[in-house]
């Protein structure tokens, strides 16, 4: 544990940020699952609507560095290909 006051504050801040980032990553996974479920149901309109919700979120979080930009691009590409195949 840190002894210096600023180090203690940094430690607290990093723990809070870690919880927030974990929450955001969990949200991304949940939204991706919703898109995949919509694709499996075969409803193109529903899957496109779900995809339109997740696309800007992936872009935003990849720009902020929460997820890697290539990972965001891969998810968007794979989901869009599956939607177009419907």
Curated annotation (Swiss-Prot):
Q: Which GO terms describe its molecular function?
A: small ribosomal subunit rRNA binding; structural constituent of ribosome
- Residue span of region Disordered: 1-23
- Signal peptide region: none
Is this entry keyworded ATP-binding?
A: no
Record keyword Zinc-finger present: no
Origin: domain of life: Bacteria
For this UniProt record, give its keywords in alphabetical order, as a comma-separated list. Ribonucleoprotein, Ribosomal protein, RNA-binding, rRNA-binding
GO CC list = cytosol; small ribosomal subunit
SUPFAM superfamilies reported for this sequence: Ribosomal protein S20
Q: Please cite one Gene Ontology biological process associated with this protein.
A: translation
Pfam families assigned = Ribosomal_S20p
| General function of this protein | Binds directly to 16S ribosomal RNA.
Which family does the UniProt entry place this protein in? Belongs to the bacterial ribosomal protein bS20 family.
Q: What protein name applies here? A: Small ribosomal subunit protein bS20
Q: Which organism is it from?
A: Buchnera aphidicola subsp. Baizongia pistaciae (strain Bp)
Q: Which gene encodes it?
A: rpsT
